[in-house]
Design a protein with these regions (language model features):
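Cytosolic juxtamembrane helix and N-cap/initiation of the first transmembrane helix
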Residues: 1-36
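Juxtamembrane loop-transmembrane helix junctions in multi-pass integral membrane proteins
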Residues: 7-21, 44-48, 70-81, 114-125
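Loop-to-transmembrane helix junctions at the membrane interface
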Residues: 64-101
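Interfacial non-cytosolic loop connecting adjacent transmembrane helices
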Residues: 43-51, 96-129
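Alpha-helical membrane-associated segments of multi-pass integral membrane proteins
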Residues: 19-29, 33, 109-152
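Transmembrane alpha-helix entry/boundary detector in multi-pass membrane proteins
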Residues: 18-25, 36-63, 122-125
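Residues within membrane-spanning alpha-helices of integral membrane proteins
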Residues: 23-30, 54-61, 83-93, 127-131, ...
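Cytosolic juxtamembrane helix at the C-terminal end of the final transmembrane segment
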Residues: 65-78, 135-161
Length: 161
């Protein structure tokens, strides 16, 4: 009996408090994404990075940061749609590993008859770690947001009966 009462109080408190956990995870995902793109964009290996792929990557980074920030504000107020958005952009972060970083790892450029790797293994591991951690933050924030939003919605529906 006591545990049920404590659980109801905890759920009732959700009506008046913000979902800071999901929100903070989304903001951390943005920080990790910034570390990723700073590492990639500061690389200067010939003209390999001067391509349409980098242009698309820059646009995606801007969209990712915008969507993640909007989602962080939305999940803070238990809006389930933004939690699903976090899940989607988390999956997008995983997919990004196989686009630019993987291509750069296997690519080489020749400058003055000397062949250089576009991305060395250490940098590849770093950028993949940033993307994976960013994805993990988005996915965890999304899962927490969905669970809490559903819990709160069910409780509010029960109160309306």
């Amino acid at each position: 009996m006591m545990m049920d009462e404590q659980k109801r109080i905890r759920i009732d408190r959700m009506r008046y408090t913000k979902n800071k956990t999901s929100s903070n995870l989304a903001l951390l995902a943005i920080v990790l994404n910034v570390l990723y793109f700073v590492s990639v964009y500061e690389s200067d290996v010939g003209s390999w990075y001067y391509s349409l792929l980098i242009g698309a990557s820059i646009v995606y980074n801007l969209l990712f940061m915008l969507m993640a920030f909007l989602a962080s504000e939305g999940v803070k107020n238990y809006k389930i749609g933004y939690a699903y958005l976090l899940l989607g952009i988390g999956a997008g972060q995983i997919a990004r590993i196989f686009i630019l970083p993987l291509q750069a790892l296997h690519a080489t450029v020749t400058i003055s008859k000397v062949t250089y790797p576009v991305m060395q293994t250490g940098q590849f591991v770093y950028v993949v770690a940033c993307l994976c951690l960013s994805a993990l933050c988005c996915i965890c924030g999304g899962v927490i947001g969905v669970r809490r939003s559903r819990t709160l919605a069910a409780y509010q529906a029960m109160l309306e009966k």
